[in-house]
Amino acid sequence: MSIGKVRIYDLSKELNLDNRDLLAICEQLGIAYKSHSSTISDADADRIREAAKTYQPHSASPRKVSKTSPPVKKAPAPQKTQQIVAVHTQPRSETPEAPKPQLQKPPARPQPPQAPTRPTPPAPVAPKPVEPVAAKPPAPPAKPEPTPPRPVPTLVPPPTRPTKKEEKVAATPPPRKELKEPPKKEKGAIAAAKPSSQDRIEIVQRAVPPAPAKPPEMAPKPALPELQPPPKPVRAPNPPKPVTETVEVLDDKSVSKVIKDRHRHKDFDEEESKRKSSRVVKLREEIIDEEEELELTSRLVGVHQVTVDVSQSLQRPPKPKVPRPARPVTPAAKTEKSSEKKQSRHRDRRPEEPAEAPPPDHITIAGPMSVQELATLVRRPEAEIIKTLFFKGIAATINQTLEVETIELVAKELGITVETAEHKVEATKVTEMLESSDLDHLQRRPPVVTIMGHVDHGKTTLLDAIRNAKVAQGEAGGITQHIGAYHVDVEHNGEKHQVVFLDTPGHEAFTAMRARGARVTDIAVLVVAADDGVQPQTIEAISHAKAAKVPIIVAINKIDKESAQPERIKQELTEYGLVPEEWGGDTIMVPVSALQQQNLDTLLEMILLVAEVEDLYANPNRPAKGTVIEAHLDRARGPVATLLVQNGTLRVGDILVAGACFGRVRAMIDDRGQRVEAATPSFAVEVLGLAEVPAAGDEFEVLSDEKAARALAEERAAAQRQSRLAQAAAARRVSLTSLSSQAREGELKELNLILKADVQGSVEAILTALNQLPQDQVQLRVLLAAPGEITETDVDLAAASSAVIIGFNTTLASGARQAAEQHNVDIREYNIIYKLLDDIQGAMEGMLEPELVEEELGQAEVRAIFPLSKGVVAGCYVLNGKLVRNCKVRVLRQQQVIHTGILSSLKRLKDDVREVAAGYECGVRLDDFQQWQEGDIIYAFQTVTKRRSLGSGSDRN
């Protein structure tokens, strides 16, 4: 049984009701609908018919009017469409620049149906904007509205406006063009008034020169009526009168500027007038007398004595010699005095030149340096250094970077001993966070605990069990690839204690991040899997903790597994100096299970116990100092740095210097994603507001003066830039001999990369891993390595340099993928580091030329010889393998190769065959060898191309 459907607008026609009234009835009856074209069931339609009998439509009066005058029925619709027409606010943009009486016109424009009222602007302009406010006045225009109903449906496309301006026939085309221009330049709308459009266009061109001179005029003479034209800055420079009015108010210095500018900008459009004006300027500067200046300034300034005197004093220096005796005397005396001073200076300098310090006998260098820097250090001319290198067979320029060995060689020739400065170990723990002034205000602070260990030994899972959170599920492949800083509240002896945990990566590529974690920590928790034992990253973590002189607590994880052997783990750790307490050592070892949450309380108690022994204190009542744990560039928030406050308190609004970056702290977010106003010692927060992304591991400090912070950051940035340039020059240094030989052999290949990662630590880890790849035949060039998303600028750089873009845990900006497809740029995205390294190594191997490898086919023995007209045929017996026609063969006689050629003919039982297997006899003929003997061995082989690996390529060289 089908149910009938009725559309709402059909029902409205049937009931002679407006759609809005019918929709209102649907709302009262609770009937669902989307629009007036929706369908409803017959039952609902019957309900509506019953309700319509008693319904009093609120639009009854308009419907009655509509019967008498149909255009009025559509009057409410234009009120809605007026909002759409009002979007085209170009006419409003014209009015603010027009005279004040036009400001009253915009309220009349939003109502296009009232167009016939616009042609009477003189008197009715003011009352008619007030008329649309009332709802009743639309009745009088109902008589002339028979004409508007036709253009009413076309209100959105603007045919109604030309009807309004039919009186101005010539003004109709410009507004349509100007409707597109106003969004770019609202001033362009002035062109609607055609008689003044041309003048204003010329004005805009000449408005540039006098513009700076007029703002000062406005302040001193606010009451003058002539100040109204200055908004139109153009007409002022053309006539001389407005210029004289402006100069009256100018300063002393600006008077002379007006004198010069008047001649410079006079007749700006004509070249001849430029030359004349420039000549006049020169004549004014060189020849004009004080009396002539007085006449000129009287014309311009109205004989203002003060400004004339000032202009005279300003124009005195460029004057040539004048017959007045006073002026030439003073400059002559000055020149004599100045010459005497110069001579005395030269006399003073002459004895100082030979008094220079003698060359040093001992120098200390920090690394490679340029020839110019070496010459400055040893106090010798650059030419002498270059000559010394030339005699040693090294052609160098003044800006070339020299290796430490080369510097020692040059210094030895000059009789100077060289000492190389030792770099500080990065893993040493920072202890200078506390100053002597902090000793009187120390307070106990929470411990910073770093969880370290081999990859997949359960570090993050252990931290999850402590935090009761699922952090490991968010890491790609279950591998931690950042330093995560987490704040945990631990209950111990009925009291709440706070502990800050740092979760470091265990993958081998993240060595620098583990070293950084050990450097800022107070306690290191070494996680070792009970079923896996001590692994390479476990040993590395032990060395980092020992270098930082940090106490180590060993957590033997995964004891719930059947293959767990905790005692074997303890035995292995003793080989690296970690002896458990029960064996007489001083290392705390706790067997735990992160999944089963076993012995976690014991581990936390041990952490708090060691923290009490360490006496961890800080001064919270001072500006903050600490270390940048991690940093990255966020698409929405900008540079974001994870800071660990080690001393003092960091507050919102502080001026911060982190390495070579500085900024003001705009916001701080803790590990739970909540905004905080202050971060006390031992707390890690994300900080927003830095100008650039700082390097992970940099120390930060809060300063009170922004200028000092900026200067310190710029100084550090300059030092980093110099060291980076020196390292880049040293890394790309190639001798001429090796360069030419590699170029001849075609072995000089480069793979250009652009690396973008989520955080700075990932960038460091990937760069370190890439540098460990063999680069004997394929050199890796990282053109750009930075945190942040992949942008169109990166794509343009890759397209220009034929580079591959590598994205690690990052995204693409809008338009980057489209630009990459347009420029055929390869973008690779990864979230696990070892997959990235495998692909890069594969790409490098693909650039190597394939190797030609001999593949053995078989051997045959010559047992008979048959001379024929075409040549000598050797009757052979295949010993092993097979013989293939057209394969390469070697003929061995008494273990020596006597011929190498191609097997041109192969027959068996007088039939040509393609191959003969082992155990069969065959006839063999070679085109270029006929001296067969019985007992010769035929060695058959073929050459195949094989992809070369980086290891094999390096071994071959």
From Swiss-Prot:
Task: Show the segment(s) annotated as G3.
Answer: 503-506
MF annotations from Gene Ontology: GTP binding; GTPase activity; translation initiation factor activity
**Where does it mainly reside?**
cytoplasm
Annotated GTP binding lies at 453-460, 503-507, 557-560
Annotated GO CC locations: cytosol
Question: Pfam families attached here?
Answer: EF-G_D2, GTP_EFTU, IF-2, IF2_N
Stretch list, region G5 = 593-595
> What keywords are assigned to this protein?
Cytoplasm, GTP-binding, Initiation factor, Nucleotide-binding, Protein biosynthesis
Please name the source species: Thermosynechococcus vestitus (strain NIES-2133 / IAM M-273 / BP-1)
Q: Does the keyword Endoplasmic reticulum apply?
A: no
- Per the record, the gene is infB
Keyword tRNA processing on this protein?
no
**Ranges of compositional bias, category Basic and acidic residues:** 163-188, 250-259, 266-275
Protein name in the entry: Translation initiation factor IF-2
Question: SUPFAM superfamilies, from UniProt?
Answer: Initiation factor IF2/eIF5b, domain 3, P-loop containing nucleoside triphosphate hydrolases, Translation proteins
